[in-house]
Amino acid sequence: ENASLASLERIIYKGYTHTAKEKQSVKESFEKMHVKTPTLDTAISTLSGGNQQKVLLARWLLCEPDIMILDEPTRGIDVGAKFEIYKMMVELAKKGIAIIMISSELPEVMGMSDRIMVVSKGRITGTYTKDEIDAGSVTQNNLLSSALQEV
């Protein structure tokens, strides 16, 4: 139930939850995200950090969003779960879903982004393109300098 909260309008019919449709949607979403759980009814709090993060992403993917804002999507999770989340982000971007990723891990930002916008004190202090990143003209020091710039 927890995994389908964000998409209730898709599984409620005449005021009642369509349980079979809900379970099928959650099952498919969990399979796409490679969530490892004994059953769909397992409490999310009992799962590993990586699987908890994947459940949260699966929940929002059920809504079929046009834009996803991911704040520290891989903080504190194992390498395997990070890979799954990165893979999901690439697949979503290929489908035309815009992803705004907020991360304090600069190598992650540089590796995953088509464009990087550095924000400091509510203002954009630097913008970098994928071409600049790939050409090596953008370094972690450039990003940090932009972040520490006086606005």
Regions inferred by a protein language model and the residue ranges of each:
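Glycine-rich phosphate-binding loops of nucleotide-dependent enzymes
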Residues: 1-151
